[in-house]
């Protein structure tokens, strides 16, 4: 995709974002949708958790990625099935509401909202980890604060540039990663490390499956966004064909990319305990394989990517809150407010920025687990939606139908539930508390289930 195409696509997305009614223009082709999904995920996400996952799994990060890829593929299949059944702009909130129950759909959407609200927090935390690697004398909270101030300010004053250049940043991130892999391979082959290429990153006699499952439950963070393209169904040409294809292409491309990169990293460093800061293992590896120059390039590229990703995620979260406020799901006076001059939901942008400040009090494992609670709620219920749809709506009871509507989504359901319960205990507690708040709130909204909850408009899901 060239810059002119990015500008053209930016125009259509901006037009869609401010449209309150009517049909959204179908202007997105398959390649556009794939690029949007990859931009949302951020290819450099592969470096985010390498250190902590290697520590948890005992040096089997690629094995943990293979496990989460299986769960993601089953879930991608279920998303594809539901897009074909409900081709309007949708999400797991829509699918649960349509196939099961409006109240349950609200609670699922409420739990999944954790992803949107706290992804900017993860970005700020990652920025502080990488900047602290370059400037160890500066307290990490300063980098967190500066990152949030910058992303919030750009959301308030300069978001259009971020939309255009996100596409260029995807290419930049891939180039930085390719250089990283080449330098890693060179170090394994010609460096005096004593390490070789083997299957040890995937399997050794010391491999612990519970530990690999625990690692995989955190690695779901790397895939957040692969399903976000389902919300573009109304803007995509031939959505029943192109959205399912895009979901699989995004999941397959990202999965192969993550496994390849972490295989070479793990081959070079089977034991990350040699690093003083396990969370910051990736920038230290960059310094080791490429010296101070590549370390600076790596840090610079990563921080720019984090800022761009943070801008997009803060924009998405504030827009979601605005949609819920406008439709009466949340208090309209605050969440439905739009600044009369800028046309932006400024209160929501500031609120998401304030929530991101909680990064000062969490480590990367806790923060990733908290966000993944919402992700596994979404992944679990999209698989369950396919099964429920089969029993309630599907008349075909052939062997093929049973395989595609029960066995495949059932496998995805089982994988995701197991991964869900492999999360950190603190994340499970916070997730359950968040869900309980949502339950109390829906009791208030529906007058103890006497009325249906407000429905979120399609173009904001």
Which residues are covered by each model-predicted region?
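Membrane-interface "cap" regions at the ends of multi-pass membrane proteins
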Residues: 1-51, 55-60, 72-77, 89, ...
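Helix-loop-helix connectors at the membrane interface of multi-pass transporters/channels
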Residues: 3-6, 15, 94-97, 124-144, ...
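Helix-loop-helix junctions that connect adjacent transmembrane segments
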Residues: 19, 24, 58-62, 66, ...
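Extracellular loop-to-transmembrane helix junctions
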Residues: 46-143, 147, 250-260, 431-440
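Membrane-helix boundary/coupling elements in multi-pass transport proteins
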Residues: 88, 111-125, 223, 228-236, ...
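TM-loop-TM module centered on a large, flexible mid-protein loop between adjacent transmembrane helices
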Residues: 94-95, 101, 133, 246-311, ...
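Membrane-interface loop-to-helix entry segments
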Residues: 140-196, 247-252, 371-382, 404, ...
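A generic transmembrane alpha-helix motif of multi-pass inner-membrane proteins
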Residues: 375, 403-461
């Amino acid at each position: 995709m060239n810059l002119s195409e990015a500008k053209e696509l930016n125009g259509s997305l901006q037009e869609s974002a401010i449209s309150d009614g009517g049909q959204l223009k179908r202007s997105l082709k398959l390649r556009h949708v794939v690029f949007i999904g990859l931009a949302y995920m951020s290819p450099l996400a592969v470096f985010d958790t390498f250190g902590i996952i290697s520590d948890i799994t005992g040096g089997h990060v690629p094995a943990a990625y293979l496990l989460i890829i299986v769960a993601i593929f089953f879930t991608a299949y279920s998303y594809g099935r539901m897009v074909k059944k409900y081709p309007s702009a949708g999400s797991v909130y829509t699918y649960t509401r349509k196939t099961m129950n409006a109240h349950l759909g609200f609670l699922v959407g409420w739990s999944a909202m954790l992803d949107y609200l706290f992804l900017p927090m993860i970005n700020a935390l990652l920025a502080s980890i990488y900047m602290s690697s370059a400037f160890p004398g500066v307290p990490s909270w300063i980098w967190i604060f500066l990152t949030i101030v910058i992303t919030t300010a750009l959301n308030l004053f300069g978001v259009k540039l971020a939309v255009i250049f996100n596409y260029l940043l995807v290419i930049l991130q891939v180039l930085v990663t390719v250089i990283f892999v080449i330098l890693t391979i060179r170090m394994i082959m010609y460096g005096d490390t004593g390490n070789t290429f083997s299957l040890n990153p995937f399997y050794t006699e010391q491999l612990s499956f519970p530990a690999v499952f625990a690692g995989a439950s955190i690695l779901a963070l790397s895939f957040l966004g692969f399903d976000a393209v389902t919300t573009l169904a109304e803007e995509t040409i031939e959505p029943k064909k192109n959205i399912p294809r895009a979901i699989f292409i995004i999941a397959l491309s990202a999965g192969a990319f993550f496994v390849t990169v972490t295989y070479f990293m793990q081959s070079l460093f089977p034991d990350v305990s040699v690093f003083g800061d396990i969370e910051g293992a990736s920038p230290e590896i960059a310094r080791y394989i490429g010296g101070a120059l590549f370390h600076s390039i790596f840090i610079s590229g990563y921080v720019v990517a984090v800022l761009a990703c943070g801008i997009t995620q803060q924009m998405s979260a504030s827009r979601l809150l605005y949609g819920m406020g406008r439709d009466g799901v949340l208090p309209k006076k605050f969440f439905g407010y739009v600044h009369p001059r800028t046309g932006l939901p400024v209160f929501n942008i500031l609120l998401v920025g304030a929530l991101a400040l909680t990064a000062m009090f969490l480590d990367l494992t806790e923060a990733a687990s908290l966000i993944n609670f919402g992700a596994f709620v979404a992944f679990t219920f999209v698989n369950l939606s396919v099964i429920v749809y089969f029993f309630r709506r599907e008349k075909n009871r052939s062997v093929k139908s049973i395989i595609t509507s029960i066995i495949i989504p059932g496998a995805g359901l089982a994988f995701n539930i197991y991964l869900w319960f492999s999360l950190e205990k603190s994340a499970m507690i916070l997730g359950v508390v968040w869900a309980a708040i949502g339950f109390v709130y829906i009791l208030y909204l529906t007058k103890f289930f006497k009325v249906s909850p407000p429905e979120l408009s399609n173009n904001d899901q």
